[in-house]
């Protein structure tokens, strides 16, 4: 028999009754019932119940052990009997009568309970992450991640893509976030950067003649944490394709995402095909370029209805309306709570009206609406008895943000929100440029390296604020999973695009010398995308925080509490790297 086990703790069934077995694992739980000791033994594969009777060496040995100690046991598989079957366990029809026990690793008193979600704070969990990962939910999340990545590789290969590695030590990149830098010992005063993404390398692979690339790529950005973004390190499925237009990128990625979410989504419905929603339309209808389409409500732009209005709350402002069916009969509390929610987002309040049975409007602002206002609102919003309408007014970006969040909250409160579904969409036609309101300068709106729609002619003849880029995002349930673009592979178009944003030719030639040089040696039209692995797993696991799907994440302050990183370097090491440290003075 094997030194440690003949079977795993998730393997034994009723057909194994009478078999002598050897198991190894962790002492998950213990119960003493009528003098008989019951132990749940856990390993990677599952749980098996052990039984030890008083007066036996096995009882004495197991009785002394602490939870989470590792043991090897020898014993015989016996039936639990029909009345004692545990239907929640695959091994629930049997138990193992223990004959021999060997302690493999004793556990100290635990800092928190492993076999229950007891509300321990995240900092404690991250300090003892090796214990936290023993919890069933965390173990399930990490194995889900493993399975998803394995499936990604298989499906991408089946779609004709080739997995290739790109460098980890590289030069600083123009993605926009802060780099993590690595000092060079051999080249004093010079630094490598950890890649924010393999963007330039995957484009260079296309220029090198490799047609379809993918990589499960580690990316490093020195940026603050959010619920859907872990600081420091994250992983994405980087993809690049040659001789493609936008729809050529969409087709394999949409197929991949649909199959992944159908396979690992726990039976939740996946909406396919994914609708294509232009950026401007998304901002107007949903108040966001990351719309949660589970909310079955839409905003309507009614700015024109109130142009020249004497109602000061709306006059001269961008006005958005949110019609909500079947809520007019709700109590005043319903409306007040939604107004309070809007205030938490920065609104001064939330105007609203009800639609009465006769079609008239009632509510706090009804008296400020003219007959023409009412007629236009009724027609534009397709109002009917039982509707209520909520209004937001202000600057475009401000009212979009507030009313976009109100849209989702109202849908949840009013029963117009879908559950158990993954609603995907593509956001397309992003503006190439935007104007800084303070300086009046034109700058890139999103990705400066995407191809402008209309090419060089558009750059030379159109108002920059009217130019759209071949840029696109995948959004699912209000979470941005990926950004991508058809790349700007022509040097003259790239130089002109940067000129419009205020960069002279010499600066661009110097800053992006490597890419421009490569583009001048026969670059193919190419495009790509990079879905975030961590966010995909977060959605599939139905977790609110991305750190719940990463084995060893940094905390919100970019610290590894378990390993003690970041650490200080010894003086000798600093000298070797030609560095000195100046700490900020305390304020």
Question: Language-model segments: which ranges?
Answer:
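Class II aminoacyl-tRNA synthetase catalytic cores and aaRS-like
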Residues: 1-587
């Amino acid at each position: 028999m094997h030194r440690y086990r003949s079977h795993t703790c998730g393997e034994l069934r009723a057909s194994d009754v009478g078999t002598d077995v050897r198991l190894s694992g962790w002492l998950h739980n213990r119960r003493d019932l009528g003098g008989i000791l019951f132990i749940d033994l856990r390993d990677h594969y599952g749980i098996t119940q052990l039984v030890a009777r008083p007066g036996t060496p096995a009882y004495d040995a197991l009785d002394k052990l602490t939870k989470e100690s590792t043991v090897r046991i020898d014993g015989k598989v016996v039936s639990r009997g029909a009345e004692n079957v545990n239907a929640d366990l695959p091994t629930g029809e049997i138990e193992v009568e223990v004959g021999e026990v060997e302690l493999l690793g004793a556990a100290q008193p635990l800092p928190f309970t492993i076999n229950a979600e007891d509300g321990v704070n995240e900092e404690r969990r991250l300090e003892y992450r090796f214990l936290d990962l023993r919890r069933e939910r965390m173990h399930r999340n990490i194995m889900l991640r493993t399975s998803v990545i394995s499936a990604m590789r298989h499906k991408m290969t089946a779609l004709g893509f080739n997995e290739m590695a790109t460098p980890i030590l590289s030069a600083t990149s123009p993605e926009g976030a802060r780099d993590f830098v690595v000092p060079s010992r051999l080249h004093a005063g010079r630094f490598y950067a950890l890649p924010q993404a393999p963007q330039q390398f995957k484009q260079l692979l296309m220029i090198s003649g490799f047609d379809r690339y993918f990589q499960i790529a580690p990316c490093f950005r020195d940026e603050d944490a959010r619920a859907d973004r872990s600081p420091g390190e994250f992983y994405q499925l980087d993809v690049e394709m040659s001789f493609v237009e936008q729809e050529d990128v969409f087709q394999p990625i949409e197929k991949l995402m649909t199959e992944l979410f159908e396979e690992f989504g726990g039976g939740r419905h996946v909406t396919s095909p994914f609708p294509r929603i232009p950026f401007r339309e998304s901002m107007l209808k949903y108040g966001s370029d990351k719309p949660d389409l589970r909310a079955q409500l839409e905003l309507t732009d009614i700015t024109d209805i109130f142009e020249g209005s004497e109602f000061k709350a709306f006059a001269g402002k961008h006005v958005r309306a949110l019609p909500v069916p079947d809520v007019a009969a709700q109590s005043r509390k319903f409306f007040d709570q939604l107004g309070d929610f809007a205030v938490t987002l920065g609104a001064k309040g939330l105007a609203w009206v009800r639609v009465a049975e006769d079609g008239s409007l009632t509510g706090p602002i009804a008296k400020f609406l003219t007959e023409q206002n009412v007629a236009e609102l009724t027609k534009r919003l397709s109002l009917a008895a039982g509707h209520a309408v909520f209004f937001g007014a202000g600057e475009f970006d401000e009212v979009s943000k507030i009313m976009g969040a109100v849209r989702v909250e109202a849908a949840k409160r009013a029963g117009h929100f879908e559950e158990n579904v993954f609603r995907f969409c593509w956001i397309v036609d992003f503006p190439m440029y935007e104007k800084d309101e303070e300086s009046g300068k034109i700058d890139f709106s999103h990705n400066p390296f995407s191809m402008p729609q209309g090419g060089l002619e558009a750059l030379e003849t159109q108002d920059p604020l009217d130019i759209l880029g071949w840029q696109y995002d995948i959004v699912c349930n209000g979470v941005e999973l990926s950004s991508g673009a058809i790349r700007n592979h022509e040097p003259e178009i790239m130089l002109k695009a940067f000129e419009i944003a205020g960069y002279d030719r010499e600066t661009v030639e110097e800053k992006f010398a490597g890419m421009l040089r490569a583009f001048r040696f026969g670059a193919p039209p190419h495009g790509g995308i990079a879905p975030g692995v961590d966010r995909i797993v977060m959605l599939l696991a139905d977790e609110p925080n991305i750190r719940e799907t990463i084995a060893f994440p940094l905390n919100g302050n970019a610290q590894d509490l378990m390993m003690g990183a970041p650490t200080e370097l010894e003086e000798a090491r600093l000298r070797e790297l030609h560095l000195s440290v100046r700490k900020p003075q305390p304020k």
